[in-house]
Amino acid sequence: MFIPKANRVAIYEYLFKEGVLVAKKDSPIQKHSELDKIPNLQVIKVMQSLNSRGWVKEQFAWRHFYWLLTNEGIEELRRYLHLPPEIVPSTLTQTTRSNAVRPRGGPGGPGGGFGGASKTDDDRSNYRRGPGAYGMDKKGDVGAGTGRVEYRGGFGRASRYDN
């Protein structure tokens, strides 16, 4: 497939800048979602070419192609685009995180968990010893073992007492 050099260079530059490229597997799409003026089919074909050379690693999931730039691909694209070695894809750059002090508290510590001071062991034992805990009998006639089990025939079953 003939692809204009300007489109090919634009795809290479975007791939080198980001380090990854995504394209939907849908031929009728006229334009690629990230590269505005380049048809989606041309992006897919250029990336298939780079995959066959071993410059990118291809993955496919849920009707989308994902191409990841390999180390060999970084070197070759750097040479093709005449870029200095200081420029690297954004997937290889390290983000600087600010080491802001965040309050860290476990149970009973400062910050205490979900919404306030944590309960102590005394609070728990007082709750368990509250009214009706040990000495009082809650209703004795409720529960699973109070009634007599009765077998009755249901729909589509023979009665147990049919002979």
Swiss-Prot record:
GO BP terms in the entry: cytoplasmic translation
Any one of the GO CC terms: cytosolic ribosome
In terms of Pfam families, this protein maps to: S10_plectin
Stretches the record annotates as Disordered: 92-163
Provenance organism: Drosophila melanogaster
Q: What is this protein called?
A: Small ribosomal subunit protein eS10A
Protein location: Cytoplasm
InterPro entries xref list: Plectin_eS10_N, Ribosomal_eS10, WH-like_DNA-bd_sf
